[in-house]
Amino acid sequence: MPGLCIGILLLIGFGCTTAYKIPTPTVELLETGFSVSIPDEEGVKVVAFNVNRNRNFTSFINEGQYNVRLTEPQNGRWTTNFSSVPLRSQDVLYLWTSVQHQKAVYQDLAQPLPVCNLGGEYRPRGCSPGDDDFTDDNQLSTEDSALEPTAPSVCEPSESQVSPQIGVSICKGQLLFEETFDQLNESLWIHDVRLPLDSKDAEFVLYDGKAKVHDGNLVIEPLLWSSYRPDLSIANSRLDLSERCTGTHNRIKECILHSTGSGPSGIMPPIVTPRISTKETFAFQYGRIEIRAKLPKGDWIVPLLLLEPLTEWYGQSGYESGQLRVALARGNSVLRMPRGKLVDGRSLYGGPVLSTDAHQREDLWLSKRKISHFGDDFHTYSLDWSSNRLLFSVDGQVYGEMLNGFTELDENPRWKQGGPMAPFDKMFYISLGVSVGGFGDFVDHLRTATYEKPWANYHPQAKLQFHQAQDQWLPTWKQPALKIDYVRVFATDN
């Protein structure tokens, strides 16, 4: 949309013209961060830059992760430095610019800006293979990141790629990432602080709080709102998380919570739970991920052992860029579909997520059934992800395989612009947590051993319906925590 004239009228009777066109912004890498600038021209009053890292913009409404409003040029340019922003070779910047020229406001959306294509003196490691003259403070050390870039003595090249790049060839079967949770390395794992945004899918939780480590296991345990903020009413209060919020799609909706009880905003999230990811520190394209975990038990709890897209290349709504579930088993000890099929914690699932709809989602999942709840013991869950298939296993036993061809589903025409495995042909990062309730993992009219699912999907008061049934589901939360022994990622054998 270069030179798009929005023509916001600041005086009655002023019309939008195309006499002014926003110049192409200059984006240059700094030693840490980057600068953005445009040349000054007569009549320019205000300039605003909005930048996202690895998230495209869908409109001019949302501010960027990094944003600034300038009222004065410097040395003939409107310029700003976004310092202390760690950039990696695989990152892509998205930029929209707003300029008040005379009495009209113009807005322009730039093309995606791969970091390695930017100007400036500096380059993240990985932009210039084999060039050791560049240094990058964002390149993770083996000690801090659990990356182990040691290749076998005889190396058969793998199709796996990692970000940040590790500076050596990646060999088949090579260990790329390992976390054993002897302690919680907060330089590696970033805590989410945000409200789920998608109203068609959103679980009934607020992501906040710190995950813990106990006896060599990561522990992620959901809490009731009353335990999280006893000073704030669940039905009539306001909470602004902006200073800590990690939301990037719509910070107003993801970072500022308010409730009016029976009003349109409903109640506060009934559940608050930690969630961590390697979004800022480690991502990979193709490989085998292994997670040894003990899944939670309790009605309407779902473990999140996920791979999520680093760059939402194919879109950012309705899972247009995909999500991969390494494994999940619902926390319910007994849960039946309307026609009697059991879908409780004795059923293990793994597969891609490409839709917010619970029925469509499960149609793509692979499953395995056993006589006891998967949360009774630790199990090793594995996903082998390559350029032509997804292979799911538990404790070394394969229970399902899915070949490429997702473009044939006609869910997103942009997938046809990618490779055969699109949308799963880009970098993905690791995300760990639990969700509770929501619309994506539980169809309507499910029944436990003693009561029917207490909320209706997409009902405006679904959270309230769930909360009001607390006396039914809370007594089942005997083991609500997700426990993880280790996470490992190996290069694929492809």
UniProtKB/Swiss-Prot annotation:
InterPro entries: BGBP_N, BGBP_N_sf, ConA-like_dom_sf, GH16, GH16_GRP_C, Glycosyl_Hydrlase_16. The keyword Cell membrane applies. Residues 1-19 form the signal peptide. One of its GO terms (biological process) is innate immune response-activating signaling pathway. One of its GO terms (molecular function) is lipopolysaccharide binding. It is found in: Cell membrane. Glycans are attached at N56, N81, N185. This is Gram-negative bacteria-binding protein 1. It comes from Drosophila melanogaster. The gene is GNBP1.
